């Protein structure tokens, strides 16, 4: 498995691929931001030394450079154009932040922490790994539920291991932010003293922290944790996708009944081929809804979720969703996930004899410091009554259709692809005039262990070969473009 993963991601660094999935996608689909350096699952990524105190804008750009995440702001903006709750399925890991005093909503706590804190200067590996091994596909489809649980457990282990490093990075940047604000306040205090205005330095610092520290910290945390969740999801899902596409027999007739609609929209989907029915509490997922979710996944460079029962023959795999201005946005749901971390310290700690208020930010007093709020915090989703406080990755209910109940394979009238199976085909050293259909018929399937022969009187239908499904070319074309194979003559 390690070799397969290494092969997938070895050449991704330093390559600027074209927009994702050019074959079969809508012509008016906007291009996603370019891929940043993905690297290998086993390859460490060490952060540079802690930043120096600089203005918040420069500090934000430094974070993007350190992460290699120049597409971060564009992706944050893209989240404002969607309504789907993409993040509620992720564990919040709020317990990891209960002792992070630099996240306290009391400026006096931040001052005490900032004056005493020493930035972490030892190497910080933001690709740290957990103790759980990457699960391999089972031998039989009856083991798919266990495989799903193993994938979810692996994701949780990797997420928690990496989040410890990201938490340290956030502390280093918050320390640099605090020291810059403190230096600015000291300069203003000296100027006020020279003009004969005696002002309390600590009170000035508290006011500045209340005005700027929390806003800038939330801005840093937003791009930092987007990098964490998106980067880790890409690594794991593309590795799993490469394995799952090689074993279509495991997913024939697979039916998945999800617990909630937010589970369907979650970015991390351990099973990407559901060739039976796809339902949410027994309600079939509409084809357009699946296309809209796949549009989002495509623009975030994540594998698409395929379902033969939900897809319509001849229809594109993705459709741009229509933004509903009166509904919650993906960026707001993401901020709720981040706020669960940022508010963790203040939700359990007390300082200076005060009990931290636990209500939503909208109901807090105007003088109460917080990390911002969004309209999403006031909305009730259709499945809120049954959603646990810590949603996590809930396994779907799985079953399998019998052979006679399985949906027919989807096909399109003509594949839109740059791949030609008959280009420069040479056999036995001689140039042969052969069509793509002939090339497929000529291929010896016995080399792959496929010794089944057609029934008596049955022959291959050349029309079916002439109308190959777009999806047959999608994976090869996608990896050819993403890894720049054509550019290197591969």
Swiss-Prot record:
Phosphoserine, modified sites: 16, 351, 411, 453
Subcellular location(s) of the protein: Virion tegument; Host nucleus
Family: Belongs to the herpesviridae tegument protein VP16 protein family.
Protein purpose: Transcriptional activator of immediate-early (IE) gene products (alpha genes). Acts as a key activator of lytic infection by initiating the lytic program through the assembly of the transcriptional regulatory VP16-induced complex composed of VP16 and two cellular factors, HCFC1 and POU2F 1. VP16-induced complex represents a regulatory switch: when it is on, it promotes IE-gene expression and thus lytic infection, and when it is off, it limits IE-gene transcription favoring latent infection. May play a role in the aggregation of tegument proteins around nucleocapsids during virus morphogenesis.
Annotated site residue numbers, Critical role in activation: 443
Assembly: Interacts with VP22. Interacts with gH (via C-terminus). Interacts with the virion host shutoff protein (vhs). Interacts with VP11/12. Associates with the VP16-induced complex; binding to host HCFC1 activates VP16 for association with the octamer motif-binding host protein POU2F1, to form a multiprotein-DNA complex responsible for activating transcription of the viral immediate early genes.
Protein name: Tegument protein VP16
UniProt superkingdom: Viruses
Organism: Human herpesvirus 2 (strain HG52)
Region of interest (Transcriptional activation), ranges: 411-490
Region (Disordered): 11-35
Entry-linked SUPFAM superfamilies: Conserved core of transcriptional regulatory protein vp16 (SSF56548)
Keywords of the record: DNA-binding, Host nucleus, Host-virus interaction, Phosphoprotein, Transcription, Transcription regulation, Virion, Virion tegument
SMART domains referenced in this protein's UniProt entry, alphabetically: Alpha_TIF
Domain notes: The transcriptional activation region seems to target many proteins of the RNA polymerase II transcription machinery.
InterPro entries, A to Z: Alpha_TIF, Alpha_TIF_sf, HSV_VP16_C
UniProt-recorded Gene Ontology molecular function terms: DNA binding; molecular function activator activity
GO BP terms, alphabetized: DNA-templated viral transcription; regulation of DNA-templated transcription
This protein's GO CC annotations: host cell nucleus; viral tegument
A UniProt-annotated Pfam family: Alpha_TIF
